[in-house]
């Protein structure tokens, strides 16, 4: 709500990455709900502003090293000069930001999956079953091959999206494809890595269970 030379913020947002550590918040909020997305603006808000409170870190299944909290705003006054994008522009800025962050998430998924594949490959060469390493069994070889196919495909999709961004070109479609494919691929690869480890994969003695949760 605009009040003189200040915007007044009220509300709560969940799932804020680094919510407990941030010095600044980039806040997207509505000044006119009747205008729907065209009524959204964005503001730069210092985390020390009176009326801001962040919750305790959310106890997540995966990505536990990432500080994730709720952030509550209660009558937080923000000067008009902190306006980053006004009505009709805030939503556009939010969508354009995804063109950068989606490839970043995608490449994280690629790295996570690659680690899982390398660990599973190493374990498969060491684990002896029926007198030979399980890496010699065709069923395991198929799983490792599918991992490599998915990882390489995801990496290329991410590179394409990132290359377009580096050139200042619009990459909304490519960024969305890269993130979606890489995220699904990481889930498949880490699940198969746990399978290759067998019962050991279900324990915290080996890191593949963590990779699966993070995926």
Where in this protein do the model-derived segments appear?
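Short, solvent-exposed coil/turn linker segments
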Residues: 46-47, 78-79, 133, 198
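Short, solvent-exposed loop/turn segments at the edges of secondary structure
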Residues: 20-22, 38, 66-68, 212-213
């Amino acid at each position: 709500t605009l009040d003189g030379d200040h915007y007044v913020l009220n509300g709560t947002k969940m799932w804020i990455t680094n919510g407990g550590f941030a010095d600044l918040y980039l806040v997207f909020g509505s000044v006119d709900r009747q205008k729907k997305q065209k009524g959204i603006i964005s503001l730069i808000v210092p985390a020390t502003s009176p009326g801001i409170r962040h919750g305790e870190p959310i106890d997540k299944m995966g990505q536990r090293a990432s500080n994730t909290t709720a952030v509550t705003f209660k009558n937080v006054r923000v000067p008009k000069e902190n306006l980053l994008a006004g009505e009709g522009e805030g939503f556009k800025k939010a969508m354009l930001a995804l063109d950068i962050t989606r490839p970043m998430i995608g490449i994280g998924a690629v790295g996570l999956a690659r680690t899982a594949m390398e660990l599973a490959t190493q374990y498969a060469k060491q684990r002896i079953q029926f007198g030979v390493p399980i890496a010699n069994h065709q069923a395991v070889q198929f799983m490792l091959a599918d991992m490599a196919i998915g990882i390489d495909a995801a990496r290329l999709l991410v590179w394409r999206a990132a290359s377009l961004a580096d050139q200042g070109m619009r990459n909304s479609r490519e960024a969305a494809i890269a993130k979606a494919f890489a995220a699904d691929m990481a889930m498949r690869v880490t699940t198969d890595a746990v399978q290759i480890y067998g019962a050991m994969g279900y324990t915290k003695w080996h890191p593949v269970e963590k990779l699966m949760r993070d995926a």
